[in-house]
Amino acid sequence: SFKDMTETLEKQIDAVASFAADVAHELKNPLTSMRSAIETLEYAETEENRKKLRTIIGDDVSRLDRLITDISDISRLDAEMSHAMMKQVNLTALLETMIDIYLTTQKDNLPNINLEIKKRRFKLRDGNVSPYFVRGLEGQLGQVVRNLIDNAISFSQKDGNIWIKMQRRNNMVEILVEDEGVGIPVDKLESIFDRFYSERPKGEAFGKHSGLGLNICKQVVDAHGGEIYAENIYDKSKNIVGARFVVLLPLADD
């Protein structure tokens, strides 16, 4: 009805206004810091102080760059999801390719990245085991996996392990991204998917994350008719020994 259309439009306008206000707030913080550092640089008396101020400016530029990139991604999501044609995506090949890229470009200070794909019982006509297929946008699904792996890396020690696992759960394909980090505060298991969620691990380089990565994951997964959530991993003594992100997507060949 016309009333429903009006209410929907009002909600969309409110959402855009809220997002714009959030963006303005997030952009203002590094800009204010950068302006202060630039103004102070002129009066710095020692090279050590000048170096500290240049570091602050560099960090703020990194933060702005990350923010602008992720804001651009978010602003494109709705348009891409509503107009793009969903195609059959081979998740098995997608994950294998992405992990190969990580391993090929892996730096010494990164944790070990492991891939474990549980084979399907369903076989193709040529006798080979079928990969996992979903209907969707390959680029967006790849971004979900990349964001989750990058998030796991940021919470991991360089000698730690990250596990990416894929298996069937009923009529869904389940992707798990697990790390051996400090875990997630129990009261933040849902809010970590909010826009501009800002809690980061101690010691992480400033500006590496915008607080939008997990929100992008949720938007993409929701648009694919799936589900994403986070949980902690516990040992036998009920101590948190890591975090697990779970993505569920409808299988395309069922």
Predicted regions and their residues:
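Conserved micro-motifs of the catalytic ATP-binding
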Residues: 79-84, 125-136
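Short helix-loop "hinge" at the ATP-lid/N-box region of the Bergerat-fold HATPase_c
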Residues: 152-153
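A conserved beta-strand-to-alpha-helix junction within the catalytic ATP-binding
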Residues: 85-100, 117-125
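Short alpha-helical segment of the dimerization/phosphotransfer core of two-component systems
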Residues: 14, 59-64
